């Protein structure tokens, strides 16, 4: 049990003491997935049968309790105020923005990492977006299975492929449309933050889709998607997999018109990620009216003084932030005045008075 009723929480301790587990638990209650693994079985202690997370929070001056449990039999129970609920409703209660050392590799990571970042941010603003992603994946898997059977020579009605492609077009076009729209909105905020940190550099975000050439309207995207599926139909049948769609797209970052992934220094890339994370915090607050909890997982030690100072000064009194660090040396005394500090050692956590 841990009381996080202060606006600013600092958890200090050596590595492998459990600091990250606390942030992961908070994040889990907002995303229903771990930031480090896609297999929820891995969050269960080796000697336990279930994983349970309970939290009480105040939202709009009203107390709300969240209860999550997951068993090794893959049984999941979600409750809000003691009443069972759906994943969609559960995830609407708590919003978080996680900034960890892994995020610093966002620009040079896999396209799937950048898609996950974008999708996670969008889903906190538009709860139905998660359902579209799930629906798209189900249709895509069904199509891939159909193509695998087809390549084996199993006699199948190929009109089913046309039906699946049309379903992919409708659902996938909606996903792409929302991604492009959100990216344009967050770019406006991120450009300004990036300009302040870097002083002179201009940031640009580009949604990279193989079959689009600047189209942004839903009908245009759907038409292009439909055409791309038809154009690559033979290739997909030969490879037995879906070759085009939002599951193959990427997000490109440019600094002064140069692609950051290829040409930016480590410091420049970290400036981009810092601007993105703080912009994510702002846009979620602006769109939903809910201030997300900012989770900073050992990330300050990886930033230079300029970026550290900008990050800490960006944390307003309205923002609840939970920070993990090996010690308090990175923080100015003025910042620490309003911070509740906990120390964790050997799995035990105590408040520093």
Regions found by a protein language model. Name each.
Residues 55, 320-327:
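Structural recognition of the conserved hydrophobic beta-strand(s) that form the central parallel beta-sheet
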Residues 297-299:
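Walker B catalytic acidic pair
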Residues 20:
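Walker A/P-loop
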Residues 1-14, 155-293, 302, 306, ...:
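Conserved NTPase motor "head" modules and their coupling/switch loops across ABC/AAA+ ATPases, GTPases
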Residues 30-107, 111-113, 117, 122-125, ...:
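Nucleotide-state sensing region of NTPase/ATPase domains
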Residues 1-6, 26, 39-40, 118, ...:
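Long, non-coiled-coil amphipathic alpha-helical linker/lever segments
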Residues 97, 322, 340-342:
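Hydrophobic/aromatic beta-strand patches that form the interior of the parallel beta-sheet core
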């Amino acid at each position: 049990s841990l009381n996080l009723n202060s606006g600013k929480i600092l958890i200090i301790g050596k590595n492998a003491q459990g600091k990250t587990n606390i942030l992961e638990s908070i994040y889990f209650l907002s995303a229903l997935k771990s930031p480090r693994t896609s297999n929820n079985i891995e969050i269960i202690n080796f000697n336990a049968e279930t994983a349970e997370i309970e939290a009480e929070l105040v939202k709009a001056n009203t107390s709300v309790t969240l209860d999550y449990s997951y068993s090794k039999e893959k049984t999941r129970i979600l409750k809000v105020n003691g009443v069972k609920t759906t994943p969609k409703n559960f995830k609407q209660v708590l919003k978080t923005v996680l900034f960890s050392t892994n995020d610093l590799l966002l620009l040079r990571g896999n396209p799937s990492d950048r898609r996950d970042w974008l999708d996670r941010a969008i889903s906190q603003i538009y709860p139905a977006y998660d359902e579209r992603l799930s629906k798209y994946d189900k249709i895509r898997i069904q199509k891939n299975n159909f193509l695998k059977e087809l390549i084996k020579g199993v006699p199948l009605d190929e009109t089913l492929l046309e039906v699946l492609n049309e379903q992919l077009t409708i659902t996938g076009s909606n996903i792409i449309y929302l991604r492009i729209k959100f990216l344009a909105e967050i770019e406006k905020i991120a450009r300004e933050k990036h300009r302040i940190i870097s002083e002179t550099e201009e940031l640009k975000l580009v949604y990279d889709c193989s079959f689009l050439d600047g189209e942004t309207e839903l009908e245009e995207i759907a038409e292009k998607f439909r055409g791309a599926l038809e154009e690559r139909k033979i290739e997909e049948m030969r490879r037995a997999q879906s070759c085009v769609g939002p599951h193959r797209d990427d997000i490109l970052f440019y600094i002064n018109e140069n692609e950051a992934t290829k040409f930016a220094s480590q410091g420049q890339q970290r400036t981009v990620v810092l601007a993105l994370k703080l912009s994510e915090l702002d846009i979620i607050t602006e769109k939903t009216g809910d201030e997300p909890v900012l989770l900073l997982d050992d990330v300050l030690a990886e930033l230079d003084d300029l970026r550290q100072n900008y990050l800490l000064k960006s944390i307003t009194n309205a923002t609840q932030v939970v920070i993990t660090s090996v010690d308090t040396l990175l923080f100015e005394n003025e910042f620490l005045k309003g911070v509740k500090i906990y120390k964790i050692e050997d799995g035990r956590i105590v408040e520093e008075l």
